[in-house]
Amino acid sequence: MMREILTSRFFPSLFKKRLDFSNRVVLGLGSNLKNPLKILKNCFLYFKNHSKIGKIFSSPIYINPPFGYTKQPNFYNATIILKTSLSLRHFFALVFYIERRFGRQRKRDFKDAPRTLDIDIIAFNQVILRQNDLALPHPKWSERDSVLVPLALQQILFKKGEW
C-alpha cells in the first residue's frame, strides 16, 4: 500500500488576487484516470483564473490507495482553500461544470469507481446543510486520509506563514 507526497509548481501554491472575497471554501480534489497530475494542475489553474475567485491555497499532492473498490489505480488527492464571491449554489454549479469539463461522468458504473476528477466541497464558510445533492460540511471528510493528510500539510504551511 504505497502512499507518497508530491510537490509541484502548483501543489502547494498560494495565489492572491487584489480582490478579497468573503466566502471561504475548502475543497477536496481527487483523480486516478488519464493523467492525474495534469488534471489536478489544470483544475487548480481553472480556479486560479476564475474572475470570482480571489485567494487560492493548495496542499501538496497525496498519492494513496483507493478505498471501497480497490482494483483501480492509486488516487492523487489534494485540498484547496479559496475565497470566492460566488454564492453556495453558484459555486456548487461551478464545481459540477469543472468536473464535466475534465471528463467526469456523473453516472458511475458503481460506487467508488475510478474517475478523471472528483471535487468535493468539504466546507463553505460555516454552513451546515443536508440536502439530497449537497451536505455540508462533507459528511465523511474526517474519515478520509485523502482529505486529512493534505489538510494537515496545509496547516503546517499555514503556520509557516504561507497563507
UniProtKB/Swiss-Prot annotation:
Copy the pathway line from the protein's UniProt record: Cofactor biosynthesis; tetrahydrofolate biosynthesis; 2-amino-4-hydroxy-6-hydroxymethyl-7,8-dihydropteridine diphosphate from 7,8-dihydroneopterin triphosphate: step 4/4
Any GO MF annotation of the entry: ATP binding
Q: Does the keyword ATP-binding apply?
A: yes
Q: Which GO terms describe its biological process?
A: folic acid biosynthetic process; tetrahydrofolate biosynthetic process
Question: Which reaction equations make up its catalytic activity?
Answer: 6-hydroxymethyl-7,8-dihydropterin + ATP = (7,8-dihydropterin-6-yl)methyl diphosphate + AMP + H(+)
The record's EC number reads 2.7.6.3
Q: Which InterPro entries match?
A: Hppk, Hppk_sf
Q: Which CDD domains match?
A: HPPK
**Coiled coil (UniProt feature):** none
Keywords, in A-Z order = ATP-binding, Folate biosynthesis, Kinase, Nucleotide-binding, Transferase
Q: Enzyme class, one word?
A: transferase
Purpose: Catalyzes the transfer of pyrophosphate from adenosine triphosphate (ATP) to 6-hydroxymethyl-7,8-dihydropterin, an enzymatic step in folate biosynthesis pathway.
PANTHER family tied to this protein: 2-AMINO-4-HYDROXY-6-HYDROXYMETHYLDIHYDROPTERIDINE PYROPHOSPHOKINASE
The family line of this record is: Belongs to the HPPK family.
User: What is the protein's given name?
Assistant: 2-amino-4-hydroxy-6-hydroxymethyldihydropteridine pyrophosphokinase
